Amino acid sequence: MAKNPNKKIQEEYKQAIKFGCVVCKKHYGVYTEPCIHHLTGAGMGIKSKSFIPLCFEHHQGSQGIHYLGNFTWEDKYGTQEELLEYYEKNK
């Protein structure tokens, strides 16, 4: 069972929610309410810092990374690392 995130991580998640979906913001210039996507392979725990905010559609929907798969999704929207860098620079 995953541990609850500490207060610092919770604040980072709140900031990500205020930022919105990184794909919607970067590609379409709009705010869309996100959920937290941990970069593939990162999991939880120490690496839980490696996350990007994604709306449902870009996370689990028909245009989502979990639906399309990493290769197709990243070909369309950029790598998760590129989006993380964009998010970190613009939050």
Give a label for each model feature.
Residues 43-52, 60-91:
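Polybasic, low-complexity binding patches
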Residues 22, 30-33, 38, 42, ...:
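Acidic/histidine-enriched, beta-strand-rich ligand/metal-binding domains
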